[in-house]
Amino acid sequence: FVRLQTIIREMNRLGMMVDLSHVSTGTMRHALEVSEAPVIFSHSSAYELCNSSRNVQDDMLKSLAKNGGLIMVNFYSKFLSCSENSTVHDAVAHINHIRRVAGIEHVGLGAGYDGINFTPKGLEDVSAYPTLFAELLGVGWSIEDLTKLAGGNFLRVMQQVEKVRDEKKAAGVKPYEDHPNFRSDDPYNCTSS
């Protein structure tokens, strides 16, 4: 935990976003406790709707909201419906679930089209975003809400990450690179002293 804490503090000092997609729930929890800047999940979905270990559980979504961070919904069918088949309605369900649990300020789009082979029917690529937005408008989303979802929330997080960086610079916070000693005590590890 000490190394993770040091790495996250240094990322905050440098103005780097902490991306928690692909990490364990324990790492999520620790990162959310430590980070002074908002964190993101760049391409994850809601665990409550599809219990993939790549998705984010509700307690973590609530912690994310307290942190000011953002989860960007992944459109990989196996993370939406837990199968190779999904539809735009599955994506809408994840977006709405995250909105209910974390709030409109904390949900975005992180489709992942560049690395997935099973996409939702009706949402096969970004050219289908108007279909997604029409579905969301049909269930009560406003244009302002869609603006946040489509990139406004991400811009807010970027600005807040930079604000934390600027505050640390103004306070004279030095690099954390010497804390702790990252060299292994293992004599067979080539990085040991």
Give a label for each model feature.
Residues 1-40, 53-69, 89-105:
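Histidine/acidic residue-rich metal-binding segments in metalloenzymes
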Residues 65-79:
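A conserved active-site cap/scaffold subdomain adjacent to cofactor or substrate pockets
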Residues 124-193:
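Mid-to-C-terminal alpha-helical segments outside catalytic/metal-binding sites
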